[in-house]
Amino acid sequence: MIKFFPLFFFITSSALFSQGGTISGVVQDEKGEPLAGANVILKNTVLGAATDDQGNYIIRKVPVGKPYQLSAMYIGHRTVTRDIHLQEGEIFTADFIMKQSLIDLDEIIVSASFSKRKKRAQASPVTVISEDELRRLPIRSVDDILLGKVPGGYANLPHRPGQNNSAFTLRGGTSGSGRPLGDVKIYVDGVELLGFDVQAYPGIADFIDPSDIEKIEVLRGPMGSTLHGSNAQSGIIHIFTKRGSSSRKTVMRMKIARKNTVAPILNDDVIGHEVSFSLSGRSTSDISYNLGANRTVDEEVMPSNGKNIELLKLHGALNARIGSAKIDIKTFQSWGKQGFISNLFHLLKYQEERGWTDAPDHWDDPVSDGSIEYYKPGFSLNFTQNFNPNWYQTLIIGNDTRQSLYRKFGSDGGESYLKHDWNRTTMNYFWHLKKKFPNLVELDVTAGVQRTQSSNVRLSGTVDEAKDQYYYDDFEDASLVDQSNSNMGYYAEAVLGYQERMFLTFGERMEENEYFGRDYGRHISPRLGLSYIWELGNLIGKARAAWGSGGINPPQAMQALPSESSYNINIGNPDLRPERQSGYEVGGDFYIGDNFFLEVTYFDQLFLDGIQNDPSIDDPGTLKQEYWYINFGEIINKGWEFAVKTRFGPLDINATYSILDSRWGQDSIRQNDPDYEGFFDEGVRRNDVPTSTANLSLAYSLPGISSKNRKGGSLVIDLNYTGEKKGRDWLKYYDGFYKPDVEPFSYYSKDVLVYYKPYVTVRLRGNYWFTNNLAAYLDIRNLTEHEDISRSITQPALGRQMIIGLDLEF
């Protein structure tokens, strides 16, 4: 089927327009400020434009002789529509004044079904983080975006600058063990990023300059992510980067920042620096571009061999319109380097405080000499062709690669190395068709095919590693690991709408997975959804319900196959089964006037055959920890999610609150074993999952200095609450290993269970434009300097982190 795509793609049904007419104007808010990036479209056509930095737009070559409806749309504002009629050669001026509004039912969402669809038709809750919000929230990683912004999102605090938070989950995730993002699939401009399935960490801090992000869509839960297939059980994050400027004027931006971070382990403060530059513009009416670079240097917050964390990121975008087709080509390149750290050195403090006289001698060994370097290139091509206003096709081709080199030098001058090459290539083709019927019924159909091919090649030399015939090819002084997986998915979704009020969704994905040479067969994932819009006075409500049985999560190579590192040994488990899930959710969205929004969702999800790290087989007397991965029975996640937005003059209030009841279901293996008593009993709460999370964000808009400089700024305070959670008392656990008068505890001993108290972290952010070209900003994270050791005492959180910087725009 794929071989016909090139021929199919360059068939065009668009006719050559006459000179036609031109529509131009300016889009402003209620204060007369220009709205950059607003979309102005002619309804029921493929014609439209986005406003430039001054709010100006222009639409050329508009066929004349018939009436049109011209609509202006901007996130956070009411859509404005007016009727127009053009004559041949006429230049029609249409200005818009847009009123702020939290009513976002007509906002276009892409993440749920790949194609563009209004939020009113979505049966699952979607969180959209706009460019305006991102400017208030300097981000360093994926979870920095989600934490506090998305109901049901939770992560432990990070322990190194710019690093992903540990074990991020949405709605409790699946196993939550060893999965950096808890089965959240991440896309950048439609291209799937490397993830846990190929042993890679998909943090956007590695390659994306935060100032290059246009908006982010977050779709939580397996009911909404069904069409995306395997490894998306907890949800979808779709990041959209910026296109070129809508204006012929070239816009240059520069950011300079200095970071000061409290390092509790070093008992000192460490310094970091960041510089970024971007350039955007438009060479012709149909071609625009965007280029940028970002450079960061951070001192280590852990005992190290003296090397800093260095990162250089470049990005570029070229956007073109050719007749009825749009082409977006984007690339990102990043280079990074850092030294080695010790995760054990600071345990000497506990050794003294708790009398660990049997502690190993190697805890205070000097950190080895060497470094870790990586190069991460990426590429995406989006081709969309409109056959008519209600029918278009899209082809997305992309690649995400990460190459790393681990180099270690011995005291004798010898060198060992580990070279890792991760690669993922994505191709996604779909078409989207809307058909209106005379009886006010509309049919909206999307169908497509998605192919993902991933690989993980590891070449190591003079490194002591265990060998396995399924895992390694041996050479004289090196070993080669070649793992690959592929996913082929066919998907379709139909939405039947009535009077723009009621929407019924039917969707299904059929996919085939092959991981490291093993065929996991064919899997079918259906979904159903219903949404209904109603009005009562100034109250608008949207009732919604969804059910889905999402894609499987096949075991990863690092779980099923043996491996060995400097610290631990995975004995492997080739009999692992894929994870599976299904669930439903019901809820509603409520809008009171333009300034109040409430979202309520109840969900019930069942996970089967979850895969989890099990170190119970470890012999404490050996230097390296031994572990393997096993399947357990059921996880039942139930809960409530609430989100509130409101506005009082210059004050915006955003709040989320989530109640999560995550418990073990039936497990025929471990529930009959007394060694696991208290951990996996049916109905027992899971470890490391908080009972509740909440966020309160207060953002105050500051007025501009004068009538010539109206940009102003904002002051934001964030309060993040993490509720009680069950976990291990790690200090007591290690007492059993290293304290001679304490009997050792097994890893799953109920005697080491403890309930960690709730805590609150505070973040303060602010920015202000002193001129139209110069702004200063401040970001203070973890003001309370909270340290969380609930998951591990070898990697505690950072202390307070303060960032001060300047923004320049010309």
Name each model feature, range by range:
Residues 28-31, 38-43, 73-78, 87, ...:
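Short, acidic, small-residue-rich periplasmic hinge/interaction motif at the N-terminus
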Residues 57-60, 191-220:
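Short acidic/polar hinge/loop motifs at secondary-structure boundaries
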Residues 147-191, 215, 226-242:
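Extracytoplasmic beta-strand/coil segments of soluble accessory domains associated
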Residues 262-276, 363-382, 416-503, 547, ...:
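Outer-membrane beta-barrel transmembrane domain signature of Gram-negative proteins
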Residues 280, 294, 319, 540-541, ...:
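Conserved C-terminal beta-signal and adjacent last beta-strands/turns
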Residues 298-307, 311-386, 393, 397-426, ...:
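Flexible loop and strand-edge segments within Gram-negative outer membrane beta-barrel domains
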Residues 424-430, 477, 483, 491, ...:
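Outer membrane beta-barrel strand-and-loop segments of large Gram-negative receptors
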Residues 606, 628-726:
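Gram-negative outer-membrane beta-barrel transporters
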